[in-house]
């Protein structure tokens, strides 16, 4: 409905105008009585120009000015009148009489508003005697067709989407933007905003509007869709008059039928309007919104989109920041900072926003300043922010001090959690009910109190009570916990407790709900995802664990020390389970740094234990020993609570296995057996530990081993269960037992077995003979290099043997281990080489000394 004057490609027409032009072209002298309605910029003038051209080419006279009253009009002349809504009633009545005679050919174009009674009568008459046509915005396809006529632009989807989104398909605006883009860099990704020259073209359209319309446009640009009552107060008009203003603005093609501005019009309104007027409208809108209890965040977001945030009043910025705090803490921090730059004093809410967003540097800097200079209420909130940030960075002792100083109910509970985490049993008594400051107990305070109860029960009560309290605390925060500032979330502590109890499904569910509810904001989201990755790793789902770990750092921010420790332990744990010795060596330095950066506490014993096994595998356990001593001392101060000590003992056992220290392994087994009555998980781990050392001493009871392995699998330690069965299989001299245990190992890995277990000894020709003890040293070397991804030729070069010899070694291992295919062989080899220390492979341990 507008000429593409850039490429002389004619018009982009909707069906109605196209049919009209076709009819006129076929019979220029035929009857013609048409009313064309459409907002400004929708192509009325372009269509009339094309109608004039068609008639003139046919030799028919064209008149484009409405006749005066009493002026004669030649019936052979086509009358084409534009902007009929601007005519006075006298001229409209002249046109009405021309229609009534039915001797004249007439086309009248007008906007939908203003519409006098005379114009309405004329439009009705044109509809009765001919047709009425409404011009609408381009569809996306029509926008694409228009751009296709511009050689510099073509029909690229990204440009079509950009132009159509910016203009809403208004033909005038499409033409302006296309013309402006034709002379600029339009490579993919280069076009982000309309060129300034295009935006400037809207200046005359805005300047001719009444002041009230200009204020209305500014209000809609800033606040989106606003109620009529609010607009009326802004422009000092009654509701009926506001409706007229809205209709006038729509008729000008500046406001869409949905009451919204297109992006390019919003940018023009905001950037071309006088700053003083824009500020006045923004302030007034803010006053009206705040007075009616409305939100101001959409107002501020609109101003930010066009780069006018600096014009926003401080009260608006702080109100919007408070609204954004729960869902967009980073944006809230930005708004608080803008308010501070405009002269508003920094407050604890600004530090809170920075902390929730995960920007602990800014949070600590602001909180420290407020602790020294702010009024008591802000100082208390600043202390909580600083305490939380310090907890995330491992300074739990200082965090506890600040929480105690803050003195609120939540802070007191978090101080209890932190004290227990550092081994302080002096706070294990139940805290007094209620808030010390006299404030009512909030859901946040109740959750904090339950969290403290759960952590207390984890060291001095039954594990079921601890887990129940922590899961309940997590549930309290799920409906509205996005703005809850937490040193550690109840969900994370519940998941840790569940992992220590072997209840991995409970851990997964509570973490999933916490992430879905955004509990603790972005600050805690990383913690929750890391624990999800930990659970996947423990189960042996190493690929999924790696993928989940990758999501933790997608935002590009560095991990805080506690999260860094867990991330390092997950990477090392995945590498160990994949038998990737190269990755273990590459990651060891970073893992040690992570341990050094975070002091040992109760909630980091899990990664410390995993790193101890990795250190033992690398022959470098001594560098971790001081931290392991600290961990054992912490547990001793707490009375060696089985819930926390059992997993560390389990890790210690495997470290002792890798370093070939039978006496140390026996100590861990003894401790695990002593704790076996504490929980089902402790009993399973104790039985597995006892079975494992028996296997290493060459005493393989396939029934006991399989029961222990399946017990580990059922408590979530799937990879460990498969490993125990595999280790026993290669150490037994009984061919039938070996087959049974290999089948068990395959089943526990979640992979299909190589076939049904043979029923008799005669059918076990593929199983190792009774004199064979596991894999030979050379086979272990080949297995490790195969698992590292080397080719047979590369392995041969490394071991100074031929590639053919390597192939024979692999074939013998596959036959000996009764694997149906290479995939099964690789999976089983991972369980067999994981515990192999370079100097002790395949050597049975001495029998335990009888005391």
Language model: regions and residue ranges:
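Alpha-solenoid helical repeat architecture
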Residues: 240, 257, 294-297, 343-348, ...
């Amino acid at each position: 409905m507008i000429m593409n004057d850039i490429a002389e490609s004619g018009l982009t027409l909707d069906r109605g105008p196209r049919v009209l032009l076709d009819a006129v072209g076929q019979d220029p002298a035929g009857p013609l009585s048409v009313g064309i309605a459409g907002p400004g910029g929708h192509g009325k003038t372009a269509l009339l120009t094309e109608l004039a051209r068609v008639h003139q080419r046919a030799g028919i006279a064209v008149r484009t000015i409405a006749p005066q009253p009493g002026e004669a009009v030649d019936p052979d002349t086509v009358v084409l009148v534009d902007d009929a809504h601007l005519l006075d009633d006298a001229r409209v009545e002249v046109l009405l009489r021309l229609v009534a005679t039915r001797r004249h050919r007439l086309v009248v174009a007008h906007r939908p508003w203003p519409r006098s009674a005379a114009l309405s009568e004329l439009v009705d008459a044109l509809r009765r005697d001919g047709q009425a046509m409404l011009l609408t915005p381009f569809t996306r396809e029509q926008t694409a067709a228009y751009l296709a006529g511009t050689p510099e632009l073509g029909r690229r989807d990204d440009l079509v989407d950009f132009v159509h989104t910016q203009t809403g398909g208004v033909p005038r605006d499409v033409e302006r933007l296309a013309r402006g883009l034709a002379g600029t860099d339009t490579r993919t990704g280069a076009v982000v905003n309309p060129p300034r020259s295009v935006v400037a073209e809207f200046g005359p359209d805005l300047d001719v509007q009444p002041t009230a319309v200009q204020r209305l446009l500014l209000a809609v640009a800033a606040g989106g869709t606003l109620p009529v009552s609010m607009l009326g107060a802004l422009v000092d008009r009654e509701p009926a008059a506001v409706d007229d203003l809205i209709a006038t603005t729509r008729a000008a093609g500046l406001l869409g039928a949905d009451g919204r501005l297109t992006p390019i019009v919003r940018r023009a309104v905001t950037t071309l309007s006088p700053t003083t007027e824009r500020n006045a409208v923004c302030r007034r809108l803010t006053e009206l919104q705040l007075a009616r209890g409305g939100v101001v965040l959409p107002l501020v977001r609109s101003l930010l989109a066009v780069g006018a945030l600096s014009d926003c009043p401080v009260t608006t910025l702080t109100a919007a920041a408070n609204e954004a705090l729960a869902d967009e803490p980073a944006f809230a921090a930005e708004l608080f900072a803008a308010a501070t730059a405009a002269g508003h004093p920094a407050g604890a809410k600004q530090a809170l926003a920075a902390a929730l967003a995960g920007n602990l540097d800014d949070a600590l800097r602001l909180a420290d300043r407020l602790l020294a200079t702010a009024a008591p209420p802000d100082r208390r909130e600043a202390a909580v922010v600083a305490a939380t940030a310090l907890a995330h960075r491992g300074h739990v002792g200082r965090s506890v001090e600040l929480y105690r100083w803050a003195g609120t109910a939540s802070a007191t509970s978090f101080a209890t959690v932190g004290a227990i985490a550092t081994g302080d049993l002096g706070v294990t008594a139940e805290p007094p009910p209620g808030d010390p400051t006299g404030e009512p107990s909030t859901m946040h305070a109740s959750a904090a109190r339950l969290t403290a109860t759960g952590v207390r029960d984890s060291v001095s009560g039954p594990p079921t009570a601890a887990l129940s309290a922590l899961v309940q605390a997590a549930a309290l925060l799920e409906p509205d916990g996005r703005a809850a500032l937490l040193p550690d979330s109840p969900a994370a502590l519940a998941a840790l407790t569940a992992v220590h109890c072997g209840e991995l499904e409970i851990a997964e569910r509570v973490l999933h709900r916490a992430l879905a509810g955004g509990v603790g904001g972005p600050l805690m989201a990383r913690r929750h995802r890391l624990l999800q990755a930990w659970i996947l790793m423990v189960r042996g789902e190493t690929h999924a664990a790696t993928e989940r770990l990758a999501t933790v750092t997608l935002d590009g921010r560095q991990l805080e020390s506690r999260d860094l420790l867990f991330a390092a332990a997950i990477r090392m744990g995945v590498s160990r389970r994949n038998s990737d010795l190269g990755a273990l060596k590459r990651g060891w330095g970073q893992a040690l740094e992570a341990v050094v950066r975070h002091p040992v506490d109760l909630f980091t014993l899990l990664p410390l234990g995993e790193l101890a096994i990795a250190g033992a595998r690398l022959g470098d356990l001594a560098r971790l020993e001081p931290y392991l001593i600290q961990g054992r001392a912490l547990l001793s101060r707490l009375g060696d609570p089985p819930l926390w000590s059992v997993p560390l003992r389990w890790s210690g056992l495997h470290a002792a296995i890798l370093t070939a220290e039978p006496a140390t392994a026996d100590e861990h087994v003894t401790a695990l057996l002593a704790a076996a009555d504490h929980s089902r998980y402790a009993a399973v781990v104790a039985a597995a530990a006892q079975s494992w050392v028996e296997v290493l001493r060459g005493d393989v009871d396939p029934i006991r081993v399989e029961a222990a392995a399946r017990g580990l699998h059922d408590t979530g330690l799937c990879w460990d269960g498969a490993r125990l069965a595999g280790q026993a299989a290669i150490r037994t001299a009984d061919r039938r037992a070996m087959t049974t245990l290999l089948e068990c190992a395959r089943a526990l890995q979640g992979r299909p077995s190589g076939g049904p277990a043979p029923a008799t000894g005669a059918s076990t020709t593929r199983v190792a003979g009774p004199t064979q003890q596991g894999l030979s040293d050379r086979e272990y070397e080949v297995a490790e290099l195969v698992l590292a991804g080397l080719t047979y030729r590369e392995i041969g070069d490394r071991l100074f043997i031929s590639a053919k010899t390597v192939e024979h070694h692999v074939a013998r291992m596959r036959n000996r281990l009764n694997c149906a295919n290479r995939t099964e062989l690789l999976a089983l080899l991972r369980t067999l080489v994981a515990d192999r220390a370079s100097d002790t492979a395949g050597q049975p341990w001495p029998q335990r000394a009888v005391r």
